Structures are given as C-alpha cells and as structure tokens.
A protein has these predicted regions:
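PLP-dependent enzyme catalytic core of the Aspartate aminotransferase-like
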Residues: 144-146, 288, 298-327
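A general structural detector for well-ordered alpha-helical segments in enzyme core domains, enriched
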Residues: 147-151, 177, 257, 282, ...
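Conserved PLP-binding catalytic core of the aspartate aminotransferase-like
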Residues: 260-289, 295-298, 307, 311
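N-terminal "arm"/small-domain region of PLP-dependent enzymes with the aminotransferase-like
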Residues: 1-58
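PLP-dependent aminotransferase class I/II
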Residues: 185-265
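Short glycine-rich anion-binding loops that position phosphate/pyrophosphate groups of nucleotides
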Residues: 26-32, 134-139, 169, 194
Length: 327
C-alpha cells in the first residue's frame, strides 16, 4: 500500500503524546456540519439517488451533465477501476502528483511514463491515455482548461483518453472542465471529501460519456455509495451559504499559511508544499512538537502542510516554524 497523509495513530505510538495537530492532509479541517441521515438511509439498500446527481450537476456548474455523472465511493474507487477498462496502453501521468494514479495504471499492465507538467504537451503525441491532476496534489500546479481540451481532442481523435483528477478543484472552479465530460474520451474525477471536509464519507463523482460510465458502474457493482453518504452529500452540495463562506475562509487561511512558508512554496487554499532541502529532518522536528505534516520522499521530495483549525494551532505551527528557521 502506498504512503498517504493521516496515520495519526502511528505518530502517537511512535512519538507519544495526545495533543497532536494533524496537518498531513489537504482536507478542509472545518468540514461541513453533516446532518443526521434518516433512519431508512441505514436500513434500505442504497439505490442511486437522482436528486444527488442533479445537485452535483448544479454545484459543478454543468446542469446538462446529468446523464454523464456517476457517484462513486470516493475518487479512489475510480482511480483503481479505470485502468481495468482499457487494453494495455501507453499511459502518461503528470508528475509529481497523486501516486495512486501511476500505481494502478502500472499494476494493470499498461506502459507507464511519469511526465513533468512542463513536458505533458509533448507526451500527448505518443500516449493513449494521459492523466493530469488539476490542481495538482501536492504542488498545486495547474493546467488551463483550453490546454486540457486541446489535449483531449488530440487523444480522442485516435481513441485515447484524457483523465483529469479535479479532487482539489472546488477552490478553483474556473479550472474545471467537468461540463465538457459528455465528450468521448474525457473523464473528470471530482471529490466531496476535500473541500467539504467529509473524507470519511467516501463519495466522489466521475464525469464521462454514458457508455464509459455504464462500464465503470458495472465494474464497481451495485450499491457502491452508502445511503447515509448520499444524504449528507445532497445537503452539502446544495448549501450555497456554507460554500460561499468556506471559500472565503479557505482563501484567507491559505494565504496566511503561504506567508509562513519558504519562498518556493506552492499549493492551493487547502495545502502548501515546498521542496525542503532536509525534508526528513523537518518532518522529525515537527513531530517532536506533536505537529504531523506530510513527508514526500521521492519525486515530490519535500513537505506538504494543510490548514490548522484553531488559533492555538496556528500559534503552535508558527512557533515550530520559527524554531526550525532559527536552528
């Protein structure tokens, strides 16, 4: 299994203490106040709710996308399944980015290349599938929608796919190309867990042409998304007041975090990453102060930090960073 953020229990076991600050993920730390599901949401088999899909279409600014949107148990479910829907192919994955993409395309017999963002344009010419994380996790790198659609046109002309992972796209809606996902060969992944702070819900969406969604749905099987998850997501996707207030708060907090970090830091309102020269030492320094950050050891060698929740947590983070810089 690949390494991810979280795993706070392991940190506590290793370093001791209980008053930890978990900044190791890019998940909104002040998530949506989930309502209690109705009793029958627990009792009945969870058939897909058309109202949830309509709410998602409205939220993503694509009201005509209804036949082209499939709820799934988190974007991870789609990431694991999509490579099984193609014969062995030449696959280029943006790098560094969310490692599960490369892992699963490689695992299912495809010829994999990990391609820096600056080289993606050239990679499209001799690839059957191109996977782009936009905005990128962990670096925050972005690709303009017009460029993505141009790449899709090249790939689709020869039966290829463009897979765009927009899991962190809620804070940058202008980057989304989900509204175009009725086009054959374009697949867009959206997450409810990140912006809404509902990672435990395990709910996301795949936007794609109807025939491909039918294949994906068949592969994932019936009752892929629980009834309680559908009810909570329906409320969250329709709560415009909460969404607007959260966008403003995340923008403010993201700028505050960025101001604390080195000049080379980049990211999104939910997290920032930088190519720390001594990432293991930094990670250890923070852990000794009961602050859990994300250490990247390989292609994205560096550190990613998410947002603190409370002012006291901000103060602890600032103090720990000041000690590191003075050391």
């Amino acid at each position: 299994m690949l390494e991810h953020g979280g795993k706070l229990r392991e940190a506590m076991q290793r370093y001791g203490g209980s008053d930890w600050i978990d900044l190791s993920t890019g998940i909104n730390p002040l998530g949506y106040p989930a309502p209690a599901p109705r009793p029958d949401a627990w009792q009945r088999l969870p058939e897909p709710d058309p109202a949830l899909v309509r709410a998602a279409c409205d939220y993503y600014g694509a009201p005509d996308l209804f036949p082209h949107l499939l709820p799934v148990a988190g974007t991870q479910a789609a990431i694991q399944a999509l490579p099984r829907l193609r014969a062995p192919a030449r696959v280029s994955v943006s790098a560094p980015s969310y490692a599960e993409h490369a892992h699963h395309w490689s695992r299912h017999g495809h010829t994999l290349r990990q391609v820096p963002y600056a080289a993606l344009d050239a990679a499209v010419r001799d690839s059957d599938v191109v996977v782009v994380v936009n905005p990128n996790n962990p670096t925050g790198a972005t690709v303009a929608p017009d460029q993505l659609l141009a790449w899709h046109a090249q790939l689709a002309a020869r039966g290829g796919w463009l897979v765009v992972d927009e899991a962190f796209g809620d804070t940058a809606p202008a980057l989304s190309i989900a509204a175009h996902a009725d086009r054959p060969g374009l697949i867009v992944l959206r997450s409810v867990g990140k912006f809404f702070g509902l990672a435990g819900l395990r709910l996301g969406f795949v936007a794609a042409c109807a025939p491909l969604l039918a294949q994906l749905e068949d592969l994932l099987g019936p009752w892929a998304v629980s009834g309680p998850a559908q009810e909570v997501a329906l409320a969250a996707l329709g709560d415009r007041d909460w969404q607007q207030a959260t966008q403003a708060r995340l923008k403010h907090d993201g700028e505050r975090l960025r101001a604390l970090l080195p000049a080379g830091a980049s990211g999104t309102p939910l997290f920032h990453w930088w190519p720390e020269a001594r990432p293991k030492a930094f990670h250890e320094h923070m852990a000794q102060r009961a602050i859990w950050v994300r250490l990247f050891r390989d292609a994205a060698r560096g550190i990613r930090i998410g947002l603190p929740v409370h002012e006291a947590h901000w103060q602890r983070l600032e103090h720990a960073l000041r000690e590191w810089n003075q050391g």
